[in-house]
Amino acid sequence: MTQTTAQRPVRTRIAPSPTGFPHVGTAYIALFNLAFAKAHGGEFILRIEDTDQSRSTEQSEQMILDALRWVGLDWAEGPDNGGPHAPYRQSERSEIYKQYAQELLDKGHAFRCFCTPEELDAMRAEQIARGENPHYDGRYANLPREESDKMAAEGKPFVIRMKVPTEGVCKVQDMLRGEVEIPWEQVDMQVLLKTDGLPTYHLANVVDDHLMEITHVIRGEEWLNSAPKHQLLYDYFGWEMPVLCHMPLLRNPDKSKLSKRKNPTSITYYRDAGVLPEALLNYLGRMGYSMPDDKEIFTLDEMIESFDITRVSLGGPIFDLEKLHWLNGEWLRALTPEQLKNKILDWANDSDKLTAIAAAIQPRIHLLSDAVNWGGFYFQNLPSITAESFEHKTLTPEQIMEILQIATWKLEALPEWSEDNIFKTLKGLSAALDIKLRDMMAPFFIAIAGSTSSTPVMNSMYVIGADMTLTRLRHAVEVLGGIGKKKLKKLEKTAADMPDFLAAE
């Protein structure tokens, strides 16, 4: 047990950003935070890091809460159940962050930077031209306080940046790696408070962890290079720093970072596909971790009972769908027929979804048994399709892949998943590509329903939901052969240059 845990009750946290679908990586890190806290008789809390107001949505926040609870993870304190350290949304704590940013300014540990975006762009361009890594050059770091106050009083926009040493190394202690040395010259003078008065992750993270009495920060290894900034902020404030533990990142089978292009990454996708929450949690618990007896199938309680964070391996754990499906099958076969029946009914019994499916198939059926043929694809994981399924009178396979890929990006960016927004997006895409909507839609029927003889596809996309729709579209692109990196980059630019289809109406 560390010195910190000997002095204070263990408290861990997960702090997701509500900017998209709930990621399996969030559940993975949440699981290890909860297991560590419970194993030490402590508490696990959840807070929402929604300082990026342009991307954060209430819908995404609710999806995160629902997904984590579905998978079997719960928290002692959070935005929905409150607690002694409320509020638990960063957007509701902006005055707190301003107070601490001002404290750093007054102590001389931070400074106002009045650079315009154009100045920063020019600075980076010059550095790149000289073969340097782009970084803030500290041009306002030593501006006299009186002059800084005067410029601020005159209304000149500014951000607050932290001061960082330019020489030597920062020594960071990590539970899995021991001492890690990072040269200060690699650490940027981080923006702490933006021009709109909202904090960046780095200030909010440190302030919240201190005020919420977090003793151990267990997070992904992508944050290891930010640890010097956080350690420096704790020093500046004179606070005790939590113990750090940087977990290995989940990987695709090719060892690249887990990405939705190669694997479905949303918790809700696995829920809708029919993975048991116990099985998904079990699988995530095996990611880079082994039980003392090398047991493969175990419950959350069993994991907590014998939990030892030092058993985490630093090799990037591979998130393999085939292994997840095998493990889920083991959990399913361990059920009694009665239990399995109830699991199936629970999985399929979404009243709103069933009503929407009934409305879609009603004009097409003559017998109740016809519902199986017309409605089966709504419940499938992925439709059974081949490249030949997409044969088209006028569109080539390359064109179809490009259409489906751009549609995926555009649909993924929708602020709200509605049939109207789906229609506007696909109608706008057909106009932008100068393809008749009727001709363009045939590949969508195949990708979503596995057949052109189906219920209206835009309605189907709405009913099966964003997660499943996007997964099926990505799957269709891969079935057609996939798009190379160079072509994909070019296609991204094409998509970015297209107008906002929702605003074009």
Curated annotation (Swiss-Prot):
Q: Which Pfam families match?
A: Anticodon_2, tRNA-synt_1c
Which GO terms fall under biological process for this protein?
A: glutamyl-tRNA aminoacylation
Q: Position of motif 'HIGH' region?
A: 16-26
Listed name of the protein: Glutamate--tRNA ligase
- Show where the record puts the motif 'KMSKS' region: 257-261
EC number(s) recorded for this UniProt protein: 6.1.1.17
- One term under GO cellular component: cytosol
What reaction does this catalyse?
Answer: tRNA(Glu) + L-glutamate + ATP = L-glutamyl-tRNA(Glu) + AMP + diphosphate
Q: How does it assemble?
A: Monomer.
- Recorded GO MF terms: ATP binding; glutamate-tRNA ligase activity; tRNA binding; zinc ion binding
Q: What does this protein do?
A: Catalyzes the attachment of glutamate to tRNA(Glu) in a two-step reaction: glutamate is first activated by ATP to form Glu-AMP and then transferred to the acceptor end of tRNA(Glu).
To which protein family does this belong? Belongs to the class-I aminoacyl-tRNA synthetase family. Glutamate--tRNA ligase type 1 subfamily.
Q: Where in the cell is it found?
A: Cytoplasm
The entry's keywords:
Aminoacyl-tRNA synthetase, ATP-binding, Cytoplasm, Ligase, Nucleotide-binding, Protein biosynthesis
Q: List the disulfide bonds.
A: none
Q: Which PANTHER family match?
A: GLUTAMATE--TRNA LIGASE, GLUTAMATE--TRNA LIGASE, MITOCHONDRIAL-RELATED
Xref: Gene3D superfamilies? 1.10.10.350, HUPs
Name the positions where ATP binds. Answer: K260
Q: What is its main location?
A: cytoplasm
